[in-house]
Amino acid sequence: MTQSIPASVQKFRREFRAKLDQQVYYGQIHVLWMLAWLLGSIVYSFCALCSVRFSEWGFLIGALIFLSFVEYWFHRGPLHKPFRAVRKFYKVHTLEHHHYFTDEAMRFYDFKDFKMVLFPAYAHALVVIAMQLLSRYFFEPAISANAGHLFAAGACLYFLLYELIHLMAHLPQDHPIFKISPLGFLRDHHKTHHRLSDMSKVNFNIAMPLFDLVFRTLKKG
């Protein structure tokens, strides 16, 4: 830990890492698992396409927009409001993630910190399975097989971008990747959300701040 990290954050991190050190966790494996499920689903969906009509590509775009809304709603709702039925989400996100990483201490330090950034491993598998079932048993009979494959690909692509951009946002401030203007913007966008006074009010989208614009919760850093 560096001297620039507030004492309260250092204390929280020490206590959390003491618990984490008692568990078997490898951040590298967590990332590989996430990539295997999400990239695997995307590749499978694209390989299954056959004679795609131009109009069917709209389901890929629609999935990206729909997942952006789901991300916004889930982040602004259950992740920041202690609803009794899903209080665990609030605990893990607001009480742990937002106290492990604040706007004054955004960066992770090693692979074990990935546990505080990535969704749990089971979530990657559940999303892929759900999207492939939706593709097969809803889109294919109701619209077309291509529509289903493109929707599933778009949904998994958005989730993949979410995870990768979230990891990126917790890189060191001076990382050269932030010289790319859109990535620097997304990093600052998320850093503002990590300000404790703002975390339940602004900047709920991470990968694509579309619905922060729609619902007027976009705040510049």
Language-model region placement:
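Cytosolic-side membrane-entry/anchor segment at the start of a transmembrane helix
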Residues: M1-S41
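Short hydrophobic/aromatic segments of transmembrane alpha-helices and their interfaces
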Residues: R14, F54-G62, L150-A153, I180-S181
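Alpha-helical transmembrane segments
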Residues: I29-A36, W57-L60, A125, A147, ...
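Hydrophobic core of alpha-helical transmembrane segments in multi-pass integral membrane proteins
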Residues: H30-A48, A121-F138
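Helix-coil boundary and interhelical linker segments in multi-pass alpha-helical membrane proteins
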Residues: V43-F59, R136-L150
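N-terminal signal-anchor transmembrane alpha helix
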Residues: G58-F74
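Membrane-embedded catalytic scaffold of the fatty acid hydroxylase/desaturase
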Residues: F69-A152, C156-G221
